[in-house]
Each structure stands twice: as C-alpha cells, then as structure tokens.
Amino acid sequence: MAQKSKKEHIIRTALTLFLEHGFKGTSVDLVVKISGVSKPTVYNHFPDKAALMHSVIKTWVENNQPTISLIKDSLALTAIIEDQWLTSEALSLYALVIGEGRRFPDAKHFFWHSFDANWQKAFTNAVDNSALPVGLTVEALLDQYLITRLKKI
C-alpha cells in the first residue's frame, strides 16, 4: 500500500470510528485494530489523536463540497438537501463537531467556514437563480425542511 493510500485508509477508518464512538470513545489502538495498520504507521502520519481528528474533518469537508446548479422546485431542493448536504453522515459529523468544538476550535472553525458556509452560499445562489417564489430565503427553506423532517421523528 502506498504511503498516501495508507494515510487515506487510516482517515476513512477513523471517520467511521469517530462518528460511531465520538472522540473520547475512539482510541488510536482501535483505529490501528480496525484499519489493520501498525501503531507506528498511524503515528508517522498523525502525531496524536487530535491531529487525526482534525485531518478526518478536513478531508471529509474537502470531499463533500456543494455541487448545486439550479433548483427547479421545492422537491428538487429537498432532494439536494437529503442526498448531498444533510446526509446521515453529515449530520453525524455536525454532532461530532458541535460536541467536540471546545476541544478542537480550529477544526470547528474550519468545518463551519469550509462546509456549512459553502453550502449556505451555494443554496443562496441556486435559490436566487431558480423558479422558486421571489423573496423566499434559504433560511426559510431550510427551516421548512427541518420542521418537516422533525415531524417525522
């Protein structure tokens, strides 16, 4: 396995573990066990668990940037939200970032400004250029979506 792919494999494994067990519940030993690499390999790429957590968030955000063109109607909007933005994995990462934000302020800042803010901008641009009613804001659409989703719980 090439160096870069080992690092990516460790990050993918750690993402799954952090989302499932949180930061405190995920040890480097568990990452080693599940990823099938040695402890020195993990530490060659990441000096500590905090650096691994930051790399996980950074890599995930870089791989999940918005790709929205035109929103034709509210059904298209809902599909984009569910399929691209607020996926179950994204919601789990939001929870992780919120829960660990004090411990990792740089990662939290990066997440909000590089993921959430980019989605907000992309939606604003898409809504502004769509056939949706004039004056309808992204915030109103998202509120409507979240209320509908919460009612299903």
Question: Where would I find each of the regions flagged by the language model?
Answer:
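A general structural signal for well-ordered alpha-helical segments in protein cores
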Residues: K49, M53, T78, L91-Y94, ...
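Helix-turn-helix
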Residues: H9, T13-A51, S55
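Amphipathic C-terminal alpha-helical segment
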Residues: D83, G99, K121-I153
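N-terminal intrinsically disordered/low-complexity leader segments
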Residues: M1-S5
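Amphipathic alpha-helical packing segments from all-alpha helical-bundle domains
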Residues: W85-S92, P105-L132
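Helical hydrophobic small-molecule/effector-binding pocket
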Residues: S74-H109, L150
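Amphipathic alpha-helical linker/stalk segments
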Residues: H54-W85
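Hydrophobic/aromatic residues within well-ordered alpha-helical segments
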Residues: K49, V56, W60, E89, ...
